[in-house]
């Protein structure tokens, strides 16, 4: 399994779903980047930073909203290590983007060796095994051959395809139960058992919480990162997780501003 040893306070945030229609969320994220650079020893972003990512070549002619976000990440990465993860929306994030930002690609899953101990980190969609249709889609788009064919298309073609896929996904999700779209408990237990860890952190489900489990007679924890929406949600929402020698603590974006 991939391992990453990091010391000091680690900040984690995921599921920002940044795009042209999320200026307030982007502004809040830029604030997080600045705060993390001041207070954290590393920032980890395990997936769905962007609502869609059709290939790293978009940065060569980035629209204003994207250019501002990239500049914010680049500035933070100049001060602390920043790790970019791939989610179900931005699975095409690659080395070109990481290099352009001075950031690192976050392997998935990854075993973090922290001041608090060993922690398993991943985006989380791989645990939603009850949603068989999504798992088939995930396997397809993670296939290197499919990705090569997609990236060979023009940017307008890729944008149109991504928009169509997003619409189909939203329509399909409306017909699915919330339970199907959540993680499968057996999949989570298997991951904890295989990694031999007591703490799992993931995003994806947009259900921030700390779950206490018992697996093989051991107390384990599953921490779910919050999603962000400062543009369309009322009240706005978002947050991040801090891991340090004292443990894990989740901070709410709105409460922290107050």
Swiss-Prot record:
Pathway: Glycolipid biosynthesis; lipid IV(A) biosynthesis; lipid IV(A) from (3R)-3-hydroxytetradecanoyl-[acyl-carrier-protein] and UDP-N-acetyl-alpha-D-glucosamine: step 4/6
Entry's Gene Ontology BP terms: lipid A biosynthetic process
Membrane topology: Peripheral membrane protein
Cofactor note: Binds 2 Mn(2+) ions per subunit in a binuclear metal center.
GO cellular component: cytoplasm; extrinsic component of plasma membrane
Residue sites binding Mn(2+) 1 per the record: 15, 17, 48, 206
Residues annotated to bind Mn(2+) 2: 48, 88, 123, 204
Subcellular location: Cell inner membrane
Chief localization: membrane
Gene Ontology MF terms: manganese ion binding; UDP-2,3-diacylglucosamine hydrolase activity
Annotated CDD domains: MPP_YbbF-LpxH (cd07398)
Named cofactor requirement(s): Mn(2+)
Binding of substrate, residues: 88-89, 131, 169, 173, 176, 204
InterPro entries with a match to the protein in the record: Calcineurin-like_PHP_ApaH, LpxH-like, Metallo-depent_PP-like, UDP-diacylglucosamine_Hdrlase
Keywords assigned: Cell inner membrane, Cell membrane, Hydrolase, Lipid A biosynthesis, Lipid biosynthesis, Lipid metabolism, Manganese, Membrane, Metal-binding
Catalytic activity: UDP-2-N,3-O-bis[(3R)-3-hydroxytetradecanoyl]-alpha-D-glucosamine + H2O = 2-N,3-O-bis[(3R)-3-hydroxytetradecanoyl]-alpha-D-glucosaminyl 1-phosphate + UMP + 2 H(+)
The keyword Cell membrane belongs to this UniProt entry's keyword annotation: yes
NCBIfam families the record matches: lipid_A_lpxH, PRK05340.1
Function comment: Hydrolyzes the pyrophosphate bond of UDP-2,3-diacylglucosamine to yield 2,3-diacylglucosamine 1-phosphate (lipid X) and UMP by catalyzing the attack of water at the alpha-P atom. Involved in the biosynthesis of lipid A, a phosphorylated glycolipid that anchors the lipopolysaccharide to the outer membrane of the cell.
Protein name, as recorded: UDP-2,3-diacylglucosamine hydrolase
């Amino acid at each position: 399994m991939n391992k990453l040893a990091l010391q000091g306070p680690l900040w984690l945030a995921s599921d920002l779903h940044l795009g042209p229609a999320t200026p307030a969320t982007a502004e809040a994220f830029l604030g997080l980047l600045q705060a993390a650079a001041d207070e954290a020893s590393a920032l980890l972003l395990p997936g769905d930073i962007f609502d869609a990512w059709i290939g790293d070549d978009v940065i060569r002619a980035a629209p204003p909203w994207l250019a501002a976000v990239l500049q914010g990440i680049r500035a933070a990465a100049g001060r602390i290590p920043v790790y970019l993860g791939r989610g179900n929306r931005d699975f095409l994030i690659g080395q070109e983007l990481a290099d352009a930002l001075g950031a690192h690609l976050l392997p998935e899953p990854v075993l973090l060796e922290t001041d608090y101990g060993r922690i398993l980190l991943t985006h989380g969609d791989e645990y939603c095994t009850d949603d068989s249709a999504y798992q088939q889609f995930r396997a397809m788009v993670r296939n290197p051959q499919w990705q090569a064919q997609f990236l060979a298309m023009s940017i307008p073609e890729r944008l149109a395809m991504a928009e169509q896929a997003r619409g189909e996904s939203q329509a399909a999700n409306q017909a699915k139960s919330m339970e199907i779209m959540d993680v499968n408990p057996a999949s989570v237990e298997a991951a904890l058992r295989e990694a031999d860890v007591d703490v799992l952190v993931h995003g994806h489900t947009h259900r921030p919480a700390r779950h206490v489990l018992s697996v093989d007679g051991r107390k384990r924890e599953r921490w779910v990162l919050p999603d962000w929406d400062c543009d369309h949600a009322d009240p706005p929402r978002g947050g991040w997780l801090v891991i340090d020698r004292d443990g894990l603590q989740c901070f709410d974006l709105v409460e922290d501003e107050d």
